[in-house]
Swiss-Prot record:
The lineage of its organism: Bacteria, Pseudomonadati, Bacteroidota, Flavobacteriia, Flavobacteriales. Keywords: Hydrolase, Periplasm, Signal. This is Putative beta-glucuronidase. Induction: By ulvan and rhamnose. It comes from Formosa agariphila (strain DSM 15362 / KCTC 12365 / LMG 23005 / KMM 3901 / M-2Alg 35-1). InterPro entries: Beta-mannosidase-like_N2 (IPR054593), Galactose-bd-like_sf (IPR008979). SUPFAM superfamilies: Galactose-binding domain-like (SSF49785). It catalyses: a beta-D-glucuronoside + H2O = D-glucuronate + an alcohol. Its EC number is 3.2.1.31. GO terms for cellular component: periplasmic space.
Length: 1163
């Protein structure tokens, strides 16, 4: 018996339906672009050529395959990750011919090409770079001499690499009475490590350990070419310090043969010119007039080549930029303190800032200028280097970031990169997208939600990582070692993936419109290196923010109380970093802004971090700070408190109780407000949202289906906002567009349903693996307290912070951090270190105790060293609830018998499988755990100005219209679904299985079939079934919906010989009202699975090629010569991800399949 359920939807109800008709007879430019996205909106991909294995036929097939599914651009990389070398060396005539052929083919097909500027993926280097033009580092040697006599002495030459060394200076100074060297000099001088947002250390240094500047003698002119110093030494003990520079020795990587060499000096335009002439110009010469047309872009990937801290002429550049000579401060680069601890630290701040400025100007900006001179755009990933990310990113025509698939997705770079684009006035924010671990086991449904979240961070262009060039046609083919999601023509779902590409293109067209809307502008500070900040608390309150660096701060102006940029950005408030340090010229700019009416918040600074204009700079900082903060012109208040108390309406406010796992972004054009809203959960949900828009008709633009609908229920408010209830499906995203004045007479303001809802069903083939209740470490972190404590010996700890302490990589693809709280005697201390750095603690004769140790990727909101709390196993409790029919389970302390768990963030963590797919959910206390199947929802829609209620269940709808009149209507009955159970005829490709036509008595996974050809099959098979539909069921007020149940992984639906849609994510439902007919109907469902099953099956067969570990040792003759294989294997994987004992993946049409009937009732 169905149970009677009140379906309360609060004040409002909306539905986004596949059943409505398209909206308006007059198609606007926005609608036209949504319906048929332009090339600019389409996805792009990296295109990796592997170890010189390239073929013309493969090039043509690759590019044609890209075009066929809607990829607009290939971005060429050349790498070597251990695959056997092919015949084509990088930059050889053969390679240049193949690049030229690629460009000709791209032109013919209508694609664009970009090329990475160097072999490998970082950064700019090659065998034509001599040591003179390579990255340079400061080296030194020192001797101690006794004075009161003349000396003629050979000074030891400092460390020399690659037989190249040049002197910088020779300095002498009295030997300090106390030996105390600068802590962490390798990152303070950028001689080995990188630390971001580094400010002067204020610890007091004893005067006996400090060199006085006036006592430093410059002996450079006394050193001859042979390294012999002649000098009359004053009385006392003197240190003679010889400083010079030598190459770091860093090379570009991972480069194939012909392309591997020294990394170029990135602070020298002369060196960059040499690099261009040897590495870029030959390509341009070969391509000719294809450059600037088909080949229109050159890329510098993320910076991964370490530090450098000198270039020829650095001293002159420093004096020009900083206004003082660095010569007397050079001993700091050898670890000595000059003048005082603080002055030394401030010089080092200037030193790092200068390195960042020179890299931005002489490498990135100069490279951009060379690109422009040759008709190319410049793309850049501006991070991970010894520079200011905001400054470097501003040099790019297309600024790029990255995000990974698999595991928990951290979005470190999208926010600051999108901010750079916004400040540059660009609507294109590129992203190296879905970087991850290969294995041919990912597909569009798994990627979608991560991509949706990336868009909400500001990305507007996906550039897939990666399409690996396939010189041969044996699948799954070449791979980028174990890296990357496999986007290429040999993947099982490549053709079917066009529906995913269409979704991307429609979405990115919308996201590229107008300008980003943000209320807060966050100043990232003046330090270099500088990675910017993440402030998720701003978005959690319903606002958005951009970041701005010191390079753009001077561009700001105030208009009508808003902080404005020259490209049209407008912000309500400028937020300063929490710091005691700021340069006076920056404070002068803040003064100008607040005098013009800007709102500025932040902590009051005390000093300048620089030695420029020392010490008058400090007096000026104090004067300005006292004035600005003393007069209340700048408020010392947190951004959260400011937003809560400033009477600034939230731009996007969820008024429902459950606000988590919803992300948004807002774009604004002259005519429209465009909100993108994404549900990250694998369950449908209803939320009520208040938008900071008024007197405009909301519309729902659904990029998956390409439909545009008007909601039936919404309301304007007097405060200038509009409330709109949204029904979001599992992992669904929609655009809410406000563009026309509201004049819909059929609008409703409230609705309530009481429905006879059928009993809930559990998720298909649900198996609970484990359920725990308590407070967990954030995703991406691992508690390693016990393992670190075991390393303490004799009250000493000497370890390297690495994932060797973990059973796995807790955050693949991200730079991780080690944090520890420990005790020495009575003192409790904390320490942190980046991955691969060393931690050395010596407690002497006191006891050293490790209290907490955590390793992984910390979220911005995770402060200090989080505690690992004990959790409760509630696996059996959850199983009991399911067995008793409770599928929506309250998450509270009753799960552990009413006891109170330790910790302040109580959550249930549950791992389960449904149809063989493993999922892990984290559900916080107070929210229900939903383990029921998703099912059709009732909807209220507007069709051609008529309000209609569409419901799959009988019941009553009560509603109120604009005039306040309350009415009701009833649907007394809804026809039962047509169940398509029983036998199905299934056809497999005849060339891949021994028995290609089979009959399934019931739907099952191919992996459960005894026939090994089917059990291990990977590819596409067709399901066939006929069913009857009565004339009565096709009456005008019935809607029919095909529900495939579970599918692994993509289904193409053909009904009565007509393709009606490709379903690539759950729920696998499709409106077929206009496709069925009275009487017999013929249904065909083409289902595509993934490669792992066939790869597992092939591992049971003899190898017909050589392996070295998981890699291919040599390319077999049968593949090179296209001859018959000597074994029954059908696959050729370049990397072994799967073994013969691995569990097979669920595959095929799993069902249950049915035709749902929904009744349409006009109001």
């Amino acid at each position: 018996m169905p149970r009677f359920l009140k379906y309360i939807l609060g004040l409002f109800l909306i539905s986004i339906s596949a059943f409505g008709q398209n909206l308006v007879p007059e198609v606007t430019e926005l609608e036209s672009g949504f319906n048929s996205p332009p090339n600019q909106a389409k996805a792009r991909t990296w295109w990796h050529w592997i170890s010189g294995n390239v073929s013309k036929s493969g090039i043509t097939k690759d590019l044609e395959a890209m075009k066929a599914v809607g990829i607009q651009e290939a971005q060429l990389f050349n790498v070597d990750l251990g695959f056997p070398a092919g015949p084509v060396d990088y930059l050889s005539e053969d390679w240049l011919d193949l690049f030229h052929f690629s460009a000709l083919e791209a032109k013919r097909i209508g694609l664009e090409l970009t090329f990475h500027n160097t072999a490998g993926w970082s950064s700019s280097g090659g065998p034509w770079i001599s040591p003179e033009y390579a990255m340079q580092t400061v080296v030194y040697s020192e001797i101690i001499v006794k004075g009161g006599k003349a000396i003629k002495k050979q000074l030891p030459q400092p460390e020399t690499k690659l037989n190249f060394y040049k002197d910088i200076a020779v300095l002498a100074f009295p030997k300090p009475k106390q030996t105390m060297k600068i802590d962490d000099l390798d990152f303070k001088s950028l001689s080995g490590r990188i630390r971001n947002h580094l400010l002067p250390d204020t610890k007091i240094i004893p005067s006996e350990a400090v060199i006085q500047k006036q006592e430093i003698i410059n002996l450079t002119a006394h050193l001859n070419d042979a390294g012999i110093l002649e000098w009359k030494v004053p009385k006392g003990e003197w240190v003679i310090l010889r400083l010079g520079h030598t190459p770091t020795g860093k090379k570009n990587h991972p480069a194939p043969k012909g392309g591997h060499g020294l990394e170029v000096d990135k602070m020298s335009t002369k060196a960059v010119d040499v690099y261009w002439e040897g590495g870029i110009q030959p390509i341009l010469n070969k391509l000719g007039d294809l450059v600037g047309t088909t080949v229109n872009n050159c890329l510098i990937d993320s910076y991964e080549v370490g530090t450098a801290n000198w270039t020829a002429g650095f001293d002159a550049e420093f004096e020009t930029l900083r206004g003082y000579s660095l010569v007397s401060y050079l001993p700091t680069l050898a670890g000595y303190y000059v003048e005082s601890g603080e002055i030394t630290e401030r010089f080092l701040w200037d030193f790092r800032r200068t390195i960042g400025d020179l890299m931005a100007k002489n490498y990135y900006a100069h490279f951009r200028d060379l690109c422009h001179k040759n008709g190319l755009k410049f793309s850049v990933e501006p991070y991970w280097g010894p520079f200011d990310n905001m400054q470097v990113g501003a040099t790019g025509d297309i600024v790029m970031c990255e995000f990974w698939s698999g595991g928990y997705p951290f979005f470190d770079s999208p926010k600051f990169v999108s901010s750079i684009a916004h400040l540059n006035g660009s609507s294109i924010v590129g992203a190296e997208s879905f970087t991850g671990i290969g294995g041919w086991d990912e597909h569009p449904a798994e990627l979608k939600s991560i991509g949706d979240r990336a868009w909400a961070e500001g990305i507007t262009r996906f550039i897939f990582h990666t399409y690996v060039h396939q010189p041969w046609d044996v699948a799954p083919g070449l791979a980028l070692s174990y890296h990357g999601t496999d986007f290429n023509r040999l993947n099982t779902w490549w053709r079917q993936g066009k529906a995913f590409m269409d979704y991307i293109a429609r979405s990115q067209f919308m996201l590229q419109q107008g300008k980003n809307v943000a209320d807060v502008l966050v100043f990232t500070g003046e330090s270099s290196p500088n990675t910017a900040f993440l402030l998720p608390e701003i978005k959690q309150l319903g606002y958005d923010y951009d970041l701005i660096g010191s390079n753009k701060l001077s561009d700001l102006f105030v208009k009508n109380g808003k902080i404005c940029t020259p490209v049209g950005g407008q912000y309500d408030v400028l937020m300063l970093p929490e710091s005691d340090w700021i340069k006076p010229e920056t404070l002068h700019k803040i003064e100008d802004l607040v005098k013009d009416g800007a709102k500025v918040i932040g902590s009051k600074p005390k000093k300048s971090p620089s030695l420029e204009h020392y010490s008058t700079c400090d007096a000026e900082v104090k004067r300005l700070s006292d004035f600005l903060w003393g007069k209340g012109l700048v408020k010392e208040i947190s951004i959260v408190d400011f937003l809560k108390g400033n009477n600034l309406l939230a731009d996007f406010k969820i008024e429902s109780d459950d606000v988590s796992d919803i992300s948004f972004i807002h774009r604004k054009t002259d005519e429209a407000d465009i909100y993108f809203i994404a549900n990250a959960r694998k369950e449908s949900r209803e939320i009520k949202v208040r938008f900071r828009v008024s007197n405009k008709q909301p519309e729902i633009w659904q990029a998956e289906s390409g439909t545009i609908k008007k909601p039936a229920v919404w309301q304007n408010h007097a405060d200038g906002t509009t409330s709109l209830p949204l029904q979001l499906g599992m992992e669904e995203a929609v655009f809410v567009v406000f563009k026309n004045a509201s004049k819909e007479k059929s609008q409703l303001v409230s609705a309530k349903m009481e429905l006879e809802n059928p009993k809930s069903e559990p998720l298909s083939n649900l198996q609970i693996i484990k359920a725990e209740y308590g407070t967990f470490l954030q995703e991406g972190l691992v508690d390693i307290t016990d393992k670190v404590a075991a390393e303490v010996k004799d009250n000493q700890l000497h370890i390297q912070a690495s994932r060797a302490f973990c059973d796995c990589d807790p955050a693949m693809g991200y730079i991780k951090e080690f944090r520890m709280e420990y005790q020495i005697g009575e003192d409790i201390k904390t320490i942190s270190a980046q991955e691969k750095e060393y931690v050395n603690i010596n407690a002497g004769d006191k006891k050293l105790t490790v209290l907490k140790a955590v390793f992984g990727k910390f979220k911005p909101e995770t402060k200090g060293v989080p505690k690992h709390y004990p959790v409760h196993d509630v696996t059996e409790k959850i199983k009991q609830e399911i067995a008793s029919g409770n599928l929506v389970i309250p998450v509270n302390n009753q799960l552990i018998g009413g006891k109170t768990p330790e910790g302040d963030n109580t959550t249930i963590k549950i791992t389960f499988t449904t149809d063989g797919e493993e999922q892990t959910l984290f559900v916080p206390k107070g929210r229900p755990l939903n383990l029921s199947k998703d099912r059709s929802k009732p909807e209220i829609v507007l069709n051609d100005g008529e309000t209609q209620w569409i419901t799959p269940y009988p019941g009553t709808l009560s509603y109120k219209n604009l005039s306040g009149k309350v009415m009701a209507t009833t649907v007394k009955s809804v026809p039962q679904p047509i169940m398509l159970a029983g036998t199905w005829d299934v056809e497999f490709p005849s060339d891949l299985v021994t028995i290609n036509k089979v009959r399934f008595d019931e739907l099952k996974s191919w992996s459960a079939v005894e026939n090994e050809g089917i059990k291990y099959f990977s590819g596409t098979a067709s399901y066939h079934k006929t069913f009857q539909v009565s004339k009565k069921l096709l009456k005008s007020n019935n809607k029919l919906e095909l529900d495939l149940g579970s599918v692994a992984v993509i289904a193409e639906v053909i009904l009565n010989g007509k393709p009606v849609g490709t379903l690539w994510k759950a729920p696998f439902r499709l409106d077929v009202t206009n496709d069925v007919k009275t009487g017999e109907n013929k249904l065909e469902v083409k289902v595509t699975n993934l490669w792992p099953n066939r790869l597992i099956g092939d591992e049971k067969l003899p190898l017909d090629f050589e392996r070295k570990g998981p890699k291919i040792k040599s390319v077999p003759d049968w593949l090179l010569n296209n001859t018959k294989r000597p074994s029954e294997r059908t696959t050729f994987p370049a990397w072994k991800h799967w073994d013969k004992e691995d569990e097979l993946l669920s595959s095929g049409l799993l069902g249950p399949v049915k035709i749902n009937v929904l009744v349409e009732k006009s109001l």
